[in-house]
Amino acid sequence: MMGKQHGGIGRYVFELASRIPKLDFQNKYIFFYNQSRVLPEDLIKLKNLPNVALIAANYRHYSLKEQTLFLRLLNQQHLDLVHFPNFNAPIFYDKPFVVTIHDMVHHKISGAKKSRFLHFLAYKKIIASAAKKAQKIITVSESSKTDIQKFLGIGREKIKVILEGSSLTGSVNDKTAREIQNKYLLTRPYFLFVGVWERKKNLINLALGFNQFLEKYKFDMDLVICGKPDAHYPEIKLKLMQIKHKDRLVIIEKPEDEDLAALYQGAFAFTSASLHEGFGLPGVEAMNFGLPLIVSNTPVFNEIYDNAAIYFNSQNPNDIADKMNLLINDSLFYNKMREASLARSAGFSWDNAAKETLELYNQVQ
């Protein structure tokens, strides 16, 4: 397992791992974790659960050791069922397992992680093996389910959609929120992006769209780009620094959850120009704070966000600018979008996700 500081999949792992054992005291749960990728305080939370054991598995994800040494470690435990929370299951593991496939992005878009041909072949072999051998596949949206069917040739009946939730709920008190916003020198209204800075996030076009918004509509606002830089895509940060109004870009790397909650609470709206997603967790987090969403017109965003979002052409910075402007001068429309956002957020819960995942475990054992 990886920790919640490692983007959407890490969050997914931690939220399920911290909930499912509390729903099921008839079984023992063993969590394999990489010590360099899990926060000590999160390990303590899991260790304190009476039916949980923790085993260190310090193998780099997507590595040969993961396919061999981790395989040996799994076989030593004589497990009744394994849940691999991402596609990278050892291809020679032949005991019952469930796998979560969050998306098929690497089949759709090139990136540094798969640019070398042999790496891409390995990815395709591993994900195909996991999908074929799993008793059940969990995915996080109907859009991803359709992609899994299309690219892996898996029947619909084998795939179960279990929606994710948001762990950032409620509100931050005003004093704390102001302190955190002052910490990051946020003195102007701001749009907020949250996510790992991968190529698929299309951050450059988002920044260009915001740049056009400033040029065209002359509003005094910032774009806060918040999240975890990806070492495989260093060019993204370099290109962001070449934007004309780069002084209006506020870059916040890897904030703590309390800071992130305050950043959501203080934002004018959430925005993302992502090209492909499996779910879109940051937008769901934003909805919990009643933020209107201004996002790319992708199938998964339409599915998950529905009427809580304004949609733009992610390849057209001018359209991004125009859609950002829609919320500025119409307070009635802005408040209507806030209400829609809060109403939509009620359909997403980690407690429900944990319950549905446990039900799936019981079906396949």
Sequence positions of predicted segments:
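Carbohydrate transferase catalytic cores enriched for Leloir-type hexosyltransferases
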Residues: 1-365
